[in-house]
């Protein structure tokens, strides 16, 4: 019988294509374990016993965390833990939490899962470890369980519970997991295989704490996990021609969206305060009420430290999971990494599924950041400064300060530019005055020579532009063009002697010598002009 059960489970771990092709014969057998979400949330046996959805959701997470911890201590593969969780989900979709102690049922499911997956653990070990976890706040727990009376009582409880679980499950041990379809599909992608497999694997493990396995087939869950993992890693999954990657899983876009959203909902839920946990515990009948004081508040971060450590606290557990087709992508996820992963998944969900956006600040398990899966907004996108006429300023003080600084910088630049312009204008004006005086000195020359020089200036493209004089020095010559474009106020002529006298005073502080030089030496003007020409030429450059 064990061989038959193992063969069924191995069949359930087949690849994506073979799963879709060969599992048709088994669909009728497992169809009774698939329900609609509305049916699960509104018509469950626990709801009929006045346990609301919030309490039942907490109880579901509670026994999943318990099973993860129990499996790690028993050092069983992750696939065995997953099988035990699915057995527990199936049991409580048919039975009420008010009539059954979830920890006792979970212990029975772990014992059964070990036998189904051919990784059995002795009943004594299962009982002892389970008892220690349930009463972990009691320092005398290790001594109590060694007492024969206590042990026999627990043993009888587990064996009676096994009968109830077997009858409730209808002796149906066919369980299909998303692990193998997940790994087989990622092998085909050839894109960030290791990272993608690890993150998607963790999403599958976290999804065990929801009712996804009661709503969707394993390959649908695998597709949702790969979708979220790709979003987190920002990996573009390849497509084969017109066939996109998710079509390999025989899943519709609506199913893919539903699976992804429900996985993300797990991380959005607020932490349950200790008072609410106590209320939930006390409201549930059976033997669970007297354990209220020993249970901490329901924190997703704490649950993550148990559920995301794949295959236990050592790598040996992962190696053993290879026998069940689940160890190919096994990894050890630290608790610190789980805390860091919260923001990534929240941001991933914010980008992909705004309808389920939550700002509860839950330290969610899983792979990160969803780097925030994403989302950094550059400041340029928040507040773009196009100009004073078209400015979009955000409400943050930082953006307002940036805008003010930029405006101030622009005003400073304009001010500096204006000062440079005025300075240049002054230099040019002085230069023009000097040129005018020099032209007066040249007045003693023939009019013909002046006209020739004027024509030469025209040929060389001299341009007088208001206050700026631009000289074309194509041939290395400086040509003076005293044209009619000069301002009339600058061309106002007095007597040549007076202007020469003024120029002499400014340059030599000896007006008499200059005046005599102009009279006695006709060539003095030419000589004086020649001496000043190189200096003016250098200023022009």
UniProtKB/Swiss-Prot annotation:
UniProt-listed CDD domains: CYCLIN_AcCycT_rpt1, CYCLIN_AcCycT_rpt2
Single GO molecular function: cyclin-dependent protein serine/threonine kinase regulator activity
Gene Ontology biological-process annotations: cell division; regulation of transcription by RNA polymerase II; response to virus; trichome morphogenesis
Top-level taxon of origin: Eukaryota
Gene3D superfamilies: Cyclin-like (1.10.472.10)
Keywords from the named record: Cell cycle, Cell division, Cyclin, Phosphoprotein
Record region (Disordered): 277-366, 445-541
UniProt keyword Phosphoprotein present: yes
Record's keyword annotation contains Phosphoprotein: yes
Compositional bias annotation for Polar residues: 307-325, 519-528
PTM annotation (Phosphoserine): residues: 396
Disulfide bond entries: none
Chain intervals with Basic and acidic residues compositional bias: 336-354, 493-511, 529-541
InterPro entries referenced in this protein's UniProt entry, alphabetically: Cyclin-like_dom (IPR013763), Cyclin-like_sf (IPR036915), Cyclin/Ssn8 (IPR043198), Cyclin_N (IPR006671)
Pfam families: Cyclin_N (PF00134), CycT2-like_C (PF21797)
PANTHER family attached to this UniProt entry: CYCLIN
Sequence similarity: Belongs to the cyclin family. Cyclin T subfamily.
Protein name: Cyclin-T1-4
Organism: Arabidopsis thaliana
